[in-house]
Each structure stands twice: as C-alpha cells, then as structure tokens.
C-alpha cells in the first residue's frame, strides 16, 4: 500500500475491496494437550499431523538423539502429505478428517525412508473409501517455493540481511512499508 518512495502495484482500493474469509480453527490431540491452529489454506493442520506422528514415533524415555530424529521424521512425513493433499479449500476437497485420524497417523508413522530420501505422501484409501477415486496431481509449475534470504555488504562494509518466509520467493512480490506480503 506504500506509494513512495518505491511505489508498488498494490493500491488502497485493493485493500479496501479485500474480503476477509473467516474459517474455523481446527484442533487435534497431543498427549494430554489439545492443539488448535489455523485451517487451510494455511498449513496449521500439518502441525497437528507433526505432533500426532511424533507421539507415535517417539518411544517413552527415548534418548535425545531418538527424540530429535523422531521429530524430524514426523515433520518430513507430515509435509509430504501437506504438499500433496493441502490446497485452497475453496478449490479442492482437503481430506483433513482422514489425514488427522488416529488410524492414519498410526499407520503413517510406520512409513520408513532413508535420511537422504524424500518421503512420498501417504495412502489415504484404506481410511476413507470415498477417496479411492480421487486423484491429486503433483505441482508441475516451475516456481520454487521456500524462504528468501538476502545478505548485502556495501563498499564501506555496512551489512544488512533479510529473511522472508512467505510461502514462495518474496511472497506476492509486493512490497509494503518494509515487508513482503504473503502469497498464502
């Protein structure tokens, strides 16, 4: 919305005409706790999956090394599912009930992979018969997703660094008053 000194393409009319979509929170259990987070299109459900998988991967009285490996594996499994099944709920049906079900999480925690391998998404058909005919396709766009980091040092040795994690590189690619707008 900033117009000077570096005007962008976002206008005050864009902000005025923006329609907020309120979505209910989603919740899931982790041991004696109840985790509540944002619903899709945000990735909050992935955090519930991570904790559900971690609980199943992490044996009682495990060593620190085992706990850390369990947490990393839980994240990798949950994000493989997130990348495959999540999206904009206005456009696709996201099978959250199945992805967060105790039966699916228990079975998913048994999926093993080498540290150098990228885990694949899980198979939901055993947990929800209505999913059997549904096909999800991988994202084939050339866009790179992730965090953007810049480090700049000028001729006088002054340094500045910026890290932005807003879904894709530079988010919407719109700069407003010192930050990039998220494209999620």
Where does each model-flagged region fall?
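A short acidic/small-residue loop/turn micro-motif
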Residues: 43, 167-169
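Fold-independent oxyanion-binding glycine-rich loops
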Residues: 38-40, 155, 163-165, 183-184
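General structural feature for long, well-ordered alpha-helical segments within catalytic domains
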Residues: 1, 11-14, 26, 46, ...
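Internal maturation/activation junctions in enzymes
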Residues: 8, 58-165, 175-176
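Active-site proximal helix-loop segment of RNase H-like, two-metal nucleases, encompassing DDE(D)
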Residues: 52-58
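Protein kinase glycine-rich loop
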Residues: 49
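Accessory "access/gating" subregions that flank catalytic or transport cores
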Residues: 1-40, 116, 125, 138-139, ...
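A short, polar/charged loop-to-alpha-helix boundary motif
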Residues: 169-184
């Amino acid at each position: 919305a900033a117009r000077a000194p570096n005007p962008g393409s976002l206008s005050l009319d864009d902000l005025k005409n923006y329609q907020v979509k309120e979505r209910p929170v989603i919740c899931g259990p982790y041991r004696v706790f109840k985790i509540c987070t944002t619903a899709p299109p945000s990735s909050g459900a992935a955090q519930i999956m991570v904790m559900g998988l971690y609980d199943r991967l992490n044996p009682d009285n495990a060593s620190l090394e085992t706990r850390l490996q369990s947490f990393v594996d839980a994240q990798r499994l949950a994000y493989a599912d997130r990348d495959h099944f999540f999206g904009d709920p206005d456009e696709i049906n996201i099978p959250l009930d199945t992805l967060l079900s105790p039966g699916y999480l228990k079975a998913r925690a048994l999926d093993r992979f080498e540290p150098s391998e990228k885990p694949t998404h899980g198979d939901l058909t055993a947990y929800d018969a209505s999913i059997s005919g549904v096909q999800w396709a991988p994202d084939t766009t050339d866009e790179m997703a992730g965090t953007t980091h810049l480090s700049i040092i000028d001729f006088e040795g002054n340094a500045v660094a910026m890290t932005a994690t807003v879904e894709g590189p530079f988010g919407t690619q719109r700069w407003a008053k010192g930050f990039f707008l998220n494209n999620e």
